[in-house]
Amino acid sequence: MSASAKPAAKSAATASAPDSFFSATIADADPEIAAAIAGELGRQRHEIELIASENIVSRAVMEAQGSVMTNKYAEGYPGHRYYGGCEFVDVAENLAIERAKKLFGAGFANVQPNSGSQMNQAVFLALLQPGDTFMGLDLAAGGHLTHGSSVNMSGKWFKPVHYGVRREDGIIDMDEVAKIAEANKPKLIIAGGSAYSRAWDFKRFREIADSVGAYFMVDMAHFAGLVAGGVHANPVPHAHVVTTTTHKSLRGPRGGLILTNDEALAKKFNSAIFPGLQGGPLMHVIAAKAVAFKEALQPDFKVYAKNVVENAKALAETLRGHGFDIVSGGTDNHLMLVDLRPKSLKGNVSEKALVRAGITCNKNGIPYDPEKPFVTSGIRLGTPAATTRGFGVAEFQQVGGMIAEVLNAIAQSEDGTAPLVEAAVKARVKELTDRFPIYQ
């Protein structure tokens, strides 16, 4: 080009994008969101996370979820898309499918559900008609909104019939489940929940379902990681369909997964997800699911799952040793419900006090709870996140002691606060979390 020649003009498309579009960081492009993210990172680093539905994902999972896969539309399924250019997202989805099948011993897997609620909606869409009767664990006894709560679509469009737990021990009475099923002849029976700490008798549930001609579904969203790690019974051989979120104890990105061994049902679930409920799948999330499934297939994940359960038992026993009531007397999985009534405490007040002390949990209703849902008589505690960062039995015994210290202090106060105790515990929490850093 001669010295007098002018450089070629930018194309209209190039000219419309600022030079920083492909290079600016979040801090440059949106300082307010960058500050919120930095604040959340600090919170996760310096607080002990005991919310049972939360976990800490690997950097690899986050990298996949923040990848260029987010740019791609891919309506349909691998090899049968409504868009071109899907050859690489097909690779990611096929890997996710095959790894999920291997992880849980299932013949078929749908990795496209955007959430746990949507995966359960898809099963309902595939197996039920509006007005059909189905059974699930009562939300007040540890079930989930999508299992027939009156405020949820499942309770509005269908006819839910609930089973509960025994008042005397907080455990599901399988004979009562059988009686309810026989009396109501549901088309679908669901096992699983969000706050039930004991093992599920999948074999008996299937026998009951078969006796009334019902489909049997297991929602293992909370304990899927324990199933993958071999420390919890696998529902896949017993159920017509199994659903799970991919986060929680499975330690992946937020999303859903549907598993079955029945090819005819698999086709129904695929159609229910697309085009029934969703359009284009979130390919960046599916890529992250594939990464998480690969992580869960490694031997060290079995060690992790074992530690989650051991830590939960240690935390429950420590709290019992400090005079706290644990619903059902203990735990077989990753979570527990603490009944605060003997301490004359409410769940909402206790949650806030623990958060001020650097321990994150959630208020939770207990079986036969007289309090309103935003007050509650209990708190729910879980061990997956703190176990991920390296806490063991000794650390959870310390955590149990700190929880007891805070709650006993606010029980003796007039306003539900104990500033000196909360501050002292928060300092010890920071010492503990500093020993087990994340995302360095």
Curated annotation (Swiss-Prot):
* Cofactor list: pyridoxal 5'-phosphate
| Disulfide bonds listed in the record | none
State the source organism's domain of life.
Bacteria
Enzyme kind, highest EC tier: transferase
What GO annotations for molecular function exist for this entry? glycine hydroxymethyltransferase activity; pyridoxal phosphate binding
Question: Which GO biological process entries does UniProt record here?
Answer: glycine biosynthetic process from serine; tetrahydrofolate interconversion
Which keywords describe this protein according to UniProt?
A: Amino-acid biosynthesis, Cytoplasm, One-carbon metabolism, Pyridoxal phosphate, Transferase
* Subcellular locations according to the entry: Cytoplasm
InterPro entries found in the cross-reference section: PyrdxlP-dep_Trfase, PyrdxlP-dep_Trfase_major, PyrdxlP-dep_Trfase_small, Ser_HO-MeTrfase, Ser_HO-MeTrfase-like, Ser_HO-MeTrfase_PLP_BS, SHMT-like_dom
Q: What is its EC number?
A: 2.1.2.1
In what pathway does it function? Answer: One-carbon metabolism; tetrahydrofolate interconversion; Amino-acid biosynthesis; glycine biosynthesis; glycine from L-serine: step 1/1
Q: PROSITE patterns annotated for this entry?
A: SHMT
Spans through the membrane: none
Q: Which of this chain's residues are annotated to bind (6S)-5,6,7,8-tetrahydrofolate? A: L139, G143, H144, L145
Q: Spell out the Pfam families in the cross-references.
A: SHMT
Question: Residue positions of the PTM N6-(pyridoxal phosphate)lysine?
Answer: K248
Marked site, Plays an important role in substrate specificity, at H247
- Primary location: cytoplasm
Q: Which GO terms describe its cellular component?
A: cytosol
Q: Which Gene3D superfamilies match?
A: Aspartate Aminotransferase, domain 1 (3.90.1150.10), Type I PLP-dependent aspartate aminotransferase-like (Major domain) (3.40.640.10)
Chemical reaction(s) catalysed: (6R)-5,10-methylene-5,6,7,8-tetrahydrofolate + glycine + H2O = (6S)-5,6,7,8-tetrahydrofolate + L-serine
Assembly, per entry: Homodimer.
Instruction: Output the PANTHER family linked to this UniProt entry.
Output: SERINE HYDROXYMETHYLTRANSFERASE, SERINE HYDROXYMETHYLTRANSFERASE 1
Q: What job does this protein perform?
A: Catalyzes the reversible interconversion of serine and glycine with tetrahydrofolate (THF) serving as the one-carbon carrier. This reaction serves as the major source of one-carbon groups required for the biosynthesis of purines, thymidylate, methionine, and other important biomolecules. Also exhibits THF-independent aldolase activity toward beta-hydroxyamino acids, producing glycine and aldehydes, via a retro-aldol mechanism.
Name the protein family: Belongs to the SHMT family.
Name of the protein:
Serine hydroxymethyltransferase
